[in-house]
Amino acid sequence: MARDLLLVVFFACLLQSFWGLPLPLKNENAIVDGDGTSVVTTKEDASTIFERDPNPANQVSAMVTGVILDENGDPGESDESVENVDNDGEGGDKDDDKNGEDNDLDNKEHEEEKGDDDRGDDEEEDDAEGDNDSNDNEGDDDDDDDSGDDDDVDESGADEDDDDDSGD
């Protein structure tokens, strides 16, 4: 009788491991995501999430993603990580430095030091250099090659295109 009971327990454990049924030795200090497979955070972290943000939707989202919320319910460790508040605690630009000064001026100075980017801005300079631009429409024949000969005329002097050059 005891042998039969041991066999039943053995096969129950074996069956449980193959089917992925929850084991009684499961870690009780862990919170797992929706499908029950991966550990996201511990109960201690979850308790800080519950204390900081009373909104249940944010609590569940924070538990699933593993994001710790600050005192205002925003992602981060403290008020210093809140992006919409400048350093004096009032609303302001995100790029203010620690003294509350705007860093936009620093960015403008950096752009001036770097110089202007003249990628294809001045077509007049290109034309003055004598470039043969196919997109110029200043009387150039786009069919001309570098020699200046009209490609529509063959070497015998006969016009290759079907136009009537008589002017009629």
Swiss-Prot record:
Keyword Signal annotated: yes
Tissue specificity of this protein: Component of the acid-insoluble and acid-soluble organic matrix of the aragonitic skeleton (at protein level).
Residue ranges with Basic and acidic residues bias: 91-117
Primary localization: secreted
Keyword vocabulary terms for this entry: Secreted, Signal
Location in the cell: Secreted
Signal peptide region: 1-20
Protein name (Swiss-Prot/TrEMBL): Secreted acidic protein 1A
